[in-house]
């Protein structure tokens, strides 16, 4: 809303065949490590949370929102100039079809997505449930396809701990924290009980890292330094650096090299731009065969980029990465992370 010449170690997952006999690369299965699965009520809560805590996002990403929701950009911009809620109404007008889980899964299958980590939220829906509760109930029968990573707000440390415990008991498989929406520093010792509980429960934490547009909060919230502090203090905690800490990708990658529980996930950024000089992603590609090989996850953020997930995966394929790296980044590392977390939960 981020020494590479040595042999890479195996991540413990089977490597799919990604080069056909004719020399054409065949895309392996995709795991979307940063997905948003909401009905319209959930999307309204999501957009309102952005508007209340980081209204810049409704402006900066206006074209992306309109493209995703099929809304008129002109009508949206006109509404946003008057009242934020009117702009949300343009995106989510009455009469939109209800969320259809079967249709969602069918689309995921068409895009080659075999699993997704769906990010939740502790915000309340009109019916009184949290978004986390709705999501956990909605995907209860398809947890092999959709794993819920429950959203937490660190504004209330005790409340965050209670939400973690409730969500874990209901089947959550990870957690999601967005510091710039809370205005909190995750590395503050006040939150240590939350991270200790996450580690003990085998719940990886997706943490928004790197650049953000919320002018009311400092840019350092969720930096590589945050991840370094958390990983050093909570050695058993599994951390996913959402957006890979961009533009400080090299520092985040070096942090991951120091801490075996840290992973980088590059949602919101298009793979096709990564090789361009000045993109900030050069370190990831330079170290792809070494320290980055088993630490990078593919993600989308769902609404940010144009086009379907399969197209983004194809952009990754076009980078001409070694077959084993391409497979690891697209799904192998995410599957290995999920298996590692499951092993902790199993005791």
What are these regions (language model features)?
Residues 172-179, 183-297:
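Catalytic pocket-lining loop regions of alpha/beta-barrel enzymes
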Residues 62-156, 289:
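Metal-cofactor-binding active-site regions of metalloenzymes
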Residues 1-31, 40-95, 102-106, 165, ...:
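Mid-to-C-terminal alpha-helical segments outside catalytic/metal-binding sites
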Residues 34-42, 208, 243:
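Histidine-centered divalent metal-coordination motifs
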Residues 112-221:
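Active-site gating/metal-coordination segments in enzymes
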Residues 37-38, 211, 246, 304:
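Short active-site segment of divalent metal-dependent hydrolases/proteases
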Residues 34, 135, 167, 198, ...:
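Conserved, mostly hydrophobic/aromatic
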Residues 132, 157-160, 248-252, 306, ...:
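Short, well-ordered alpha-helical microsegments
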């Amino acid at each position: 809303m981020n020494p590479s010449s040595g042999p890479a170690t195996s991540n413990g997952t089977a490597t799919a065949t990604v080069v056909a006999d004719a020399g054409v690369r065949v895309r392996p299965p995709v795991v979307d490590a940063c997905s948003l699965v909401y009905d319209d009520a959930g999307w309204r809560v999501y957009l309102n949370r952005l508007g209340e805590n980081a209204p810049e996002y409704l402006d900066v990403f206006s074209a992306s929102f309109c493209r995703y929701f099929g809304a008129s950009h002109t009508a949206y911009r006109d509404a946003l100039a008057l009242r934020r809620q009117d702009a949300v109404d343009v995106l989510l007008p009455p009469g939109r079809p209800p969320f259809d889980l079967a249709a969602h899964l069918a689309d995921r299958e068409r895009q080659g997505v075999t699993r997704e980590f769906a990010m939740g939220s502790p915000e309340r829906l009109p019916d009184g449930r949290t978004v986390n509760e709705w999501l956990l109930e909605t995907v209860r029968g398809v947890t092999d396809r959709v794993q819920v990573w429950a959203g937490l707000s660190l504004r209330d440390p005790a409340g965050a701990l209670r939400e973690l415990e409730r969500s874990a008991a209901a089947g959550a498989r990870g957690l999601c924290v967005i510091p710039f929406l809370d205005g909190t520093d995750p590395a503050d010792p006040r939150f240590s009980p939350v991270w200790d509980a996450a580690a003990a429960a085998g719940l990886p934490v997706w943490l928004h890292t790197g650049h953000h547009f919320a002018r009311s909060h400092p840019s350092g919230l969720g930096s590589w330094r945050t991840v370094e502090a958390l990983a050093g203090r909570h050695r058993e905690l599994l951390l996913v650096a959402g957006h890979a800490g961009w533009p400080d990708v090299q520092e985040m990658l070096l942090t991951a090299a120091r801490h075996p529980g840290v992973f980088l996930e590059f949602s919101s950024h298009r793979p096709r731009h990564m090789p361009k000089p000045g993109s900030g992603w050069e370190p990831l590609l330079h170290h792809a065969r070494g320290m980055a090989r088993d630490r990078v996850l593919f993600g989308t953020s769902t609404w940010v980029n144009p086009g379907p997930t399969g197209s983004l995966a194809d952009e990754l394929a076009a980078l001409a990465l070694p077959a084993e790296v391409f497979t690891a980044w697209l799904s192998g590392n995410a599957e290995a992370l999920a298996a590692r977390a499951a092993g902790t939960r199993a005791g």
